[in-house]
Amino acid sequence: MTTEITTVKCPTCKQAVVWDETSIYRPFCSKRCQLIDLGEWADEEKRIPSDDMVSDSEDWSETR
């Protein structure tokens, strides 16, 4: 019985990453790539697409 090894590309640097429980940062190849990705989300360089163009001020207006 042969076990096939699954690999994916790191979303940050595109290096091959083995997809199993020994790859603690999967889908990233390293903690560095994981933190780079987190920083991109925090800086809003990455976002989930949406059809609604609602500003934050409309959703969170103060009421008294």
Curated annotation (Swiss-Prot):
Keyword match Isomerase: no
GO biological process: regulation of DNA-templated transcription
Alphabetized SUPFAM superfamilies for the sequence: Glucocorticoid receptor-like (DNA-binding domain)
Residues the record lists as binding Zn(2+): 10, 13, 29, 33
Pfam families: YacG (PF03884)
Required co-factors: Zn(2+)
Note accompanying the cofactor annotation: Binds 1 zinc ion.
UniProt keyword terms in alphabetical order: Metal-binding, Zinc
A single MF term (Gene Ontology): DNA topoisomerase type II (double strand cut, ATP-hydrolyzing) inhibitor activity
HAMAP family: DNA_gyrase_inhibitor_YacG (MF_00649)
Protein family according to the UniProt entry: Belongs to the DNA gyrase inhibitor YacG family.
Assembly behavior: Interacts with GyrB.
Protein's job: Inhibits all the catalytic activities of DNA gyrase by preventing its interaction with DNA. Acts by binding directly to the C-terminal domain of GyrB, which probably disrupts DNA binding by the gyrase.
Name of this protein: DNA gyrase inhibitor YacG
Source species: Pectobacterium carotovorum subsp. carotovorum (strain PC1)
Lineage summary: Bacteria, Pseudomonadati, Pseudomonadota, Gammaproteobacteria, Enterobacterales
Encoding gene per record: yacG
